Amino acid sequence: CEIEPAVVEAARVHLADVNRGVLDDPRTQVVLDDARHYLATTNETFDIITSDPIHPWVRGAAALYTAEYYDLVKARLRPGGVVTQWVPLYQTDAAAVKSQLATLFDAFPFATIWNSDPTNQGYDLVAMARALPMSFDMTRMQTHIEDLPTVRGSLGECDLGSALALLSTYAGDASSLSGWLADAERNVDVSLRLQYFAGLALDRYQDHAIYAAMRAAFSVPDGMFTGADHELDALYAALLR
């Protein structure tokens, strides 16, 4: 979904080399609508629902982080479907980040978080969740990456061109962060508290401190990662560095 038609045209004309011409792919269907409105009014279900709105202090964006929104997402996911959500750590504070994550984790108790900062100090995160526990087979993932040159190329541009590099961005899960989130206030439609939490901190850059607090609670659940012994040894060395 895209709410502004000019954005679609700009992406087609100016960003085709970056998005690999996805808008001209016959498999691509662009829906010109507010994404939440579309989910609320369609009967269609999806394998993946990804939400990458503008920062939650911008008016309206916090509605894509509410408990009601996540209930709607759950209703539109197919069995085994995955939801991803952007979580900024900059221009915000710990209260806002906690609100975002706790609200998501209430709806998806097996959610995981992944760090997008190559320095591993924290800048923003991607939360990934589904209805059931997740596990990641390193051997199978590496095979898929090698068999899909377009995917491999895209990941390589971000220095994530292997299963080891990709899975090394793992930053925690709902269970390990439960203590840190104990005082979190949930974001709901009636108040949109997240919008005001984030707005009060838009001139702050506490991303490294917030991420350090999250890392203090870091752990890897048993069975989350599988693969050959040498693959797992390399992964755990990267995760615990």
Predicted features and spans:
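The AdoMet/dcAdoMet-binding core of the Class I SAM-like
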Residues: 1-101, 105-107, 113, 120-122
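Soluble small-group transferase modules, centered on the S-adenosyl donor enzyme superfamily
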Residues: 26, 34-36, 41, 113-241
